[in-house]
């Protein structure tokens, strides 16, 4: 039976969501990605969030949680959020190894649910855009059919759609070759369902807020390394790691804000030419 997570939403109340993405953790906590210790940057982000953790009703982790595909990396992710009271749901990114991801996160009590009902007004659907072994994304026929079924059976619910890969160009040609390859097929499905108003992704390690045929498309900074916007070639940014908060309101509106660490201690090796 398909796993469904249900969250209450009373009256005109809002549901507050924390998005964490692209943590790129390793089995060994001392390891670094492009000069940034990803465990330490993840911990710093969580410490910045922790004073406000009681405000969140749900945590969404939108892929690339591990860099080395190890079970230990996913255990470290779970360790980081263990003190947060909000449930967490997740989806895979191109760097993730799903068997280890599923097993380690489930063992840690993190839900494998790919559908979340929020009161009577909202649903969140989590898609798997991973094509294992390559950086670009694609939604399988199964995923597209699953999406269409879930949208059709809840037409009264405002819908937030989550996936790892960005379906629209971000303006970085080196990144955009690794986007969602069959975004047109996704658009065809979504065109049938006007209650899908928002999409949220990770992958591009930078903030993005675009209109996609009347839908709002959001992307969020990584908790570690940042990619510099509007660059044709691989370029790292020196801006601090970040995360996103979102509020879903009973009337179908969404408000959101990107947050970043206040200091600049997590500086990448800007001479790096890729990873």
Curated annotation (Swiss-Prot):
Residues where Fe cation 1 binds: 22, 24, 64, 205
Cofactor note: Binds 2 Fe(2+) ions per subunit.
EC number(s) per entry: 3.1.4.53
Reaction catalyzed: 3',5'-cyclic AMP + H2O = AMP + H(+)
Swiss-Prot/TrEMBL cofactor(s): Fe(2+)
Pfam families: Metallophos (PF00149)
UniProt entry tagged with the keyword Cell inner membrane: no
Keywords for this protein: cAMP, Hydrolase, Iron, Metal-binding, Nucleotide-binding
Keyword Zinc: no
Binding site for AMP: 24, 64, 94-95, 205
Binding positions (Fe cation 2): 64, 94, 164, 203
GO molecular function, one term: ferrous iron binding
InterPro entries per record: Calcineurin-like_PHP_ApaH, cAMP_phosphodiest_CpdA, CNP_phosphodiesterase-III, GpdQ/CpdA-like, Metallo-depent_PP-like
Functional description taken from the UniProt entry: Hydrolyzes cAMP to 5'-AMP. Plays an important regulatory role in modulating the intracellular concentration of cAMP, thereby influencing cAMP-dependent processes. Specific for cAMP.
Record family assignment: Belongs to the cyclic nucleotide phosphodiesterase class-III family.
Name recorded for this polypeptide: 3',5'-cyclic adenosine monophosphate phosphodiesterase CpdA
Organism the protein comes from: Escherichia coli (strain K12)
Lineage: Bacteria, Pseudomonadati, Pseudomonadota, Gammaproteobacteria, Enterobacterales
